[in-house]
């Protein structure tokens, strides 16, 4: 049975999106070369969809610049959208060695890249370290050019409060683009929230994530929430904290006084400062922060407090930590798709693709 047909029986995506995804993947993989696409009638037979849905599929692909439709002749692959043969792409990721989330994303990119005739060259952590310390961008670009790298998946350094870091992230992305290397941002932008850069960006809806974290704790009986993050003023923190505030305001809960705490989770003085607010619910930037903070908190205080993290790392499952699971596989697949589109001379405005994170409730918020 056709994979898209199977997906329609099990997926919540609209049927036209599932069929469009299937056709798009084949176009980018070169299966249609520069030839004619299936007609509306052929799509109806192949996927068991209505005529209106088939028309919407072709209209969607046309709006993306992948196909052109000729009156009386049908739909054809846009010559500018054909994926380049055996193009090379690479990664430039600040946190590759410290978060399993990015490892999962890169694995997904590698799997999907092959379907788009893209060859992935893994970027070394050392490369980002050199660039983040004002290493020569010219040298990095020269290495990319020598390796025939046409595109880079870029996760910027996560410290937007530091002006030097913010400017360096922007300089890296803009220099690569100026030198003819396509950039797709993953997880975070190169400008402070709520601003958006003019690069394609794939990640989760961080405002929604903070909202879901807070709403879950409120549903579990919490009324005094605070947000706990590390010392760096990162793009994702500001977005998620906004989401938490939205949830508090929606539920008529107090938002006065300090609600956002940044610090070292292993520092007793920081933990005490947070707990002096007498919170009954803690929202953490990610699970690692929750594990470190609660380890210190449990030594200092006998009272219990409910909490939730984000990322759903392997330790969280064993420790019973409620979390939000980011769809790493889909983020990687979408990043690869956007890269293939851009390398195929796609000229649509910059895209921001945001996924929802899945709530995984466990003992830390549910009790027991």
For each of these PLM feature ranges, what is it?
Residues 2-7, 11, 21-25, 32, ...:
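Alpha-helical recognition/docking segments in bacterial nutrient-uptake
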Residues 26, 198-199, 271-368:
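Flexible loop/turn connectors
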Residues 36-69:
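N-terminal helix-turn-helix
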Residues 190-191, 196-227, 266-271, 326-345:
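Hydrophobic alpha-helical segments within soluble ligand-binding/sensing domains
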Residues 211-253, 347, 351-366:
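An alpha-beta-alpha
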């Amino acid at each position: 049975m056709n994979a898209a047909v199977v997906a329609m029986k099990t997926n919540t995506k609209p049927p036209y999106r599932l069929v469009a995804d299937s056709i798009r993947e084949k176009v980018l993989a070169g299966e249609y070369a520069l030839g004619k696409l299936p007609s509306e009638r052929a799509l109806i037979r192949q996927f068991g969809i209505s005529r209106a849905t088939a028309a919407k599929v072709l209209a969607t692909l046309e709006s993306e610049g992948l196909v052109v439709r000729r009156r009386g002749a049908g739909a054809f692959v846009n010559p500018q959208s054909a994926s380049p043969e055996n193009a090379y792409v690479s990664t430039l990721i600040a946190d590759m060695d410290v978060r399993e989330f990015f490892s999962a994303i890169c694995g997904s990119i590698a799997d999907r890249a092959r379907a788009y005739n893209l060859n992935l060259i893994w970027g070394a952590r050392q490369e980002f370290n050199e660039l983040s310390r004002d290493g020569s961008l010219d040298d990095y670009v020269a290495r990319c050019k020598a390796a025939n790298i046409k595109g880079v998946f870029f996760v910027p350094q996560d410290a937007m409060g530091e002006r030097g870091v913010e400017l360096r992230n922007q300089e890296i992305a803009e220099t690569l683009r100026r030198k003819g290397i396509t950039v797709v941002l993953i997880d975070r932008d190169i400008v402070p929230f709520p601003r958006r850069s003019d690069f394609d960006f794939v990640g989760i809806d961080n405002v929604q994530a903070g909202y879901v974290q807070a709403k879950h704790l409120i549903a579990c009986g919490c009324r005094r929430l605070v947000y706990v993050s590390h010392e760096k003023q990162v793009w994702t923190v500001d977005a998620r904290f906004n989401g938490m505030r939205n949830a508090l305001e929606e539920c008529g809960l107090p938002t006065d006084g300090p609600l956002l705490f940044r610090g070292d989770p292993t520092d007793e003085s920081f933990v005490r400062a947070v707990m002096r607010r007498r919170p009954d619910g803690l929202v953490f930037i990610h699970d690692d922060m929750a594990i470190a903070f609660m380890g210190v908190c449990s030594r200092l205080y006998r009272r219990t407090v409910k909490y939730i993290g984000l990322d759903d790392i392997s330790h969280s499952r064993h420790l019973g930590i409620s979390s939000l699971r980011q769809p790493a596989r889909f983020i990687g697949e979408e990043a690869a798709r956007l890269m293939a589109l851009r390398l195929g001379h796609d000229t649509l405005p910059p895209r921001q693709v945001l996924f929802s994170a899945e709530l995984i409730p466990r003992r830390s918020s549910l009790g027991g």
